[in-house]
Structure formats: C-alpha cells, structure tokens
Amino acid sequence: YRLFTFTCEWGNKSLQSRNIPQWLLDKDLWIRSKGVTDTVMAAINKTIDFFGEGIGVHTYYWHNYPYDTHYPDYFPAKPEFEGMISTIQKRKCHAVPYINGRLWDPAADSYTALNGASASCRKADGTLYTEIYPTSKVLNTVTCPASSLWHKIIIGLVDKIQNELHTNGVYIDQIAAAAPQPCFAKNHGHAAGGGDFWYKSYKALIDSIRGNHLRKDNIVFSEENSECYIPLFDMLLTVNTPHANCSIVPLFPTVYSDRVITCAYTYTPTADVTKGEFRYQNMQCFLYGSQLGWVDPTL
C-alpha cells in the first residue's frame, strides 16, 4: 500500500517539497492551553521554564463565547489573548489558536444575519445534519464545504486571527477527522448526494488560504489523519487513537512518515497524567514519529 500511495494526489509530495516552516519541522512538543487567565499563563510559563524555548502552544477557549457554541462567531477575542500570544512568542515559542472548520451554531448571530441555513449540509428530505457535543450540549449544524459563503467566513477568520492577534497560524478543527455527508442542497454547485465534492471543496478552501492568506512562516493544521488531507495541512493532530478492545499498530506512520507531520497520540485525561499509562502513551507517540504532547499545561 505504501508504494501505491506515491501514485496518489495526497501521497506524491515529500515534506521537503511542501514549504513547511522550519520551526514546525524542528518542533518536538505541543501543549494545549484552555482559557486566557493568569493561571493558564503561569502554567504556560512554567512549562517553557522546564522544557525550554520552541514549544508549540495550541490555544483554546480564547474566544468570546463558550467552547462549541456560537461558531463561527469567535470575535471579539478575550481582551488578554493578544497579550498572551505576544508573551508566548517573546519566549521563542509559537501559538496557534482553535477554530472549527465544519460547524455553524444556529444560535449564532451570524447564522441569522448571513442566512447560515443556506450553507448547511442537507439530507435527502431537506433537513439539516446536526450534532451535539458533551462539551457544550448545544446543537450545531454541519456546514457544506462547497458553500461559497462558508469559504468566505473561514478565510475571513484566518485573516482576522493573523492580522489582529498576530498568531503563528490557525488550527481548523474536524476537517481531516469528520466523515463527509451526502448533501442534497441545490445551491452549493455540486451534484446531489455524495461524491468527491466534499474533499475537493475543502481542498479549494485550504489551497486558497495557503496561496493567498496564510502569512509567511505561519501554519494551518487540522484534526486527525484522513489521508487525502495530508498535503493540505502542515500538520495533523492525531488524538482520537482508540484503546478499548484493540491493539495499536503504527500502520499510518509506517506508510506516510516521510510525507506528513503528526502531533500527539491520544487524549490525556487529567487523572492519567501521573500514572504509568501516560508515560507509556508518550513513548508510543515518540516511537511512532509524532511530535509529543497536546497536554494541558495546568496539569
């Protein structure tokens, strides 16, 4: 299979040919900060004190509304967030904030103001695909990636985050993780139902971001490791590794390690950090060639 992947659109580019910033190639540790408080900033500083410069800080809960609600209305950012980014960068580390690339909350002001329903992915009966996550218990709609309105919104967010917050790029959640949905909307410019439009639409979006909006030496990355998205993103965050009733084998890195950068290995519950399992999982992460971490620094 590895040999076959070199003949595919997603597998025929080496890391060296993809213009990935050197700082990301050199990165060996990521932390996941949640919130913009003195406690969080103190934990980040303590982590940098211990591990040294060059840490990647993946920032969550920086936006105006609670997590997994009111997407894509992230602005205004919390007042202290720009200063937090600056502090991280002055310590010769890098900060990349979270946005979601797939969900639109129907309770968001923008959903009404911009007619978000027109961008929503539609089932055959015309109803919406909806999802509720335990982090918020709020209903979100799945947006069709072929929607030109959605492209405009995501690109606008990428521009605003870089221009106003001066980050080292943007993380766009779920794109490389969530399965495509058949869409029967008549206004999105694709054939009704399933097809490769899902991937091609996200490719067009990310290609536009990379070609016209991503600042020099900034990165864009996404969740999980669906192989068709490998060349679109500078890095893939692999954190949904299953554990129950299975044995983990490093199939993905065996096939793709020379063409993709991955970060992390699994979610790390708070209770596990002081246990042997945490060390074992980090050992697996290291052996499988993934950049270490994605652990809350306050732990």
What does each model-found stretch correspond to?
Residues 1-61, 69, 73-74, 80, ...:
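Carbohydrate-recognition beta-sandwich/jelly-roll modules
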Residues 29-39, 139-153, 270-272:
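Active-site mouth loops of central-metabolism enzymes
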Residues 33-35, 59-61, 97-101, 174, ...:
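A cross-domain feature marking catalytic cores of carbohydrate-active enzymes
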Residues 38-39, 64-68, 102-107, 177-181, ...:
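Flexible loop/turn segments at secondary-structure boundaries
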Residues 43, 47, 88, 149-211, ...:
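Active-site and adjacent substrate-binding regions of carbohydrate-active enzymes
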Residues 56-79, 110-147, 178-203:
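Aromatic- and acidic-residue-enriched carbohydrate-binding clefts of CAZyme catalytic domains
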Residues 79-165, 242-259, 263-264:
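Active-site-adjacent "subsite" loops/lids of carbohydrate-active enzymes
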Residues 198-299:
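Active-site-proximal substrate-binding groove within the catalytic cores of carbohydrate-active enzymes
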